[in-house]
């Protein structure tokens, strides 16, 4: 009997499911980082598929900065209830005590304390030896050269000059005491692949990815959504109601929207087919001096 050939998305799906099962088999205490974005939504869907009909043996971890869009938090809690996954939420208590935020302390300090340090705290407290994430190689140049199994030392630091070879679909999961591994099952996916898979599988995503009239102000060439009253307005600044959507989601004062009328999956995919800009163009932290993705990863960022 001749089996029909696998489609491009079928091959990507099979590869990702293989990686997830490999992690479950090789590591003592793996965890999946759930940032609530489109890549995390795809990763959660794959995790559920990989171990169906049983519940996934890998818990989810969300490192909450207290500055995520309100729709993201509502979506996170709703999906956790719908899928009955083991979702754990960590907020850096030291950051809370100092009331660290992107406006009061700046983007670099906020990202380091609430994201990087918060992530390291959560991994250490949970005793996790592998953390699965939804990063893709097409997102950013430092991620383009990272392995699927990315090894970190006892301080969670990444050494891009000291990576293990990965031959075909063979992964080396051995670690020394104190070391851990970041695993990226979506490494070979593109942004368009993600949206095509979401469309094919009908995966729920945060409504912020779809265009709608939203209150925004323009700062440094980016449309920043006024999500709550913590965002101080500049003198003479008045929020405008514009049809915008987000290609990437993070802390709302640091995430720029794009003007768009794409309010359906089909329209988003059509927009993606003609886009010539990076999806991370709206991440304000990427443009800060000395805040390159590689530098953040060297310090323990995901």
UniProtKB/Swiss-Prot annotation:
Keywords: ATP-binding, Nucleotide-binding, Nucleotidyltransferase, Transferase. It is an enzyme of class 2 (transferase). The keyword Transferase applies. Its EC number is 2.7.7.4. Gene3D superfamilies: HUPs (3.40.50.620). GO terms for biological process: hydrogen sulfide biosynthetic process; sulfate assimilation. GO terms for molecular function: ATP binding; sulfate adenylyltransferase (ATP) activity. InterPro entries: PAPS_reduct_dom (IPR002500), Rossmann-like_a/b/a_fold (IPR014729), SO4_adenylTrfase_ssu (IPR011784), Sulfate_adenylyltrnsfr_sub2 (IPR050128). The keyword Nuclease does not apply. Pathway: Sulfur metabolism; hydrogen sulfide biosynthesis; sulfite from sulfate: step 1/3. It comes from the Bacteria. It catalyses: sulfate + ATP + H(+) = adenosine 5'-phosphosulfate + diphosphate. Belongs to the PAPS reductase family. CysD subfamily. Heterodimer composed of CysD, the smaller subunit, and CysN. With CysN forms the ATP sulfurylase (ATPS) that catalyzes the adenylation of sulfate producing adenosine 5'-phosphosulfate (APS) and diphosphate, the first enzymatic step in sulfur assimilation pathway. APS synthesis involves the formation of a high-energy phosphoric-sulfuric acid anhydride bond driven by GTP hydrolysis by CysN coupled to ATP hydrolysis by CysD. This is Sulfate adenylyltransferase subunit 2. It comes from Xanthomonas campestris pv. campestris (strain ATCC 33913 / DSM 3586 / NCPPB 528 / LMG 568 / P 25). The gene is cysD.
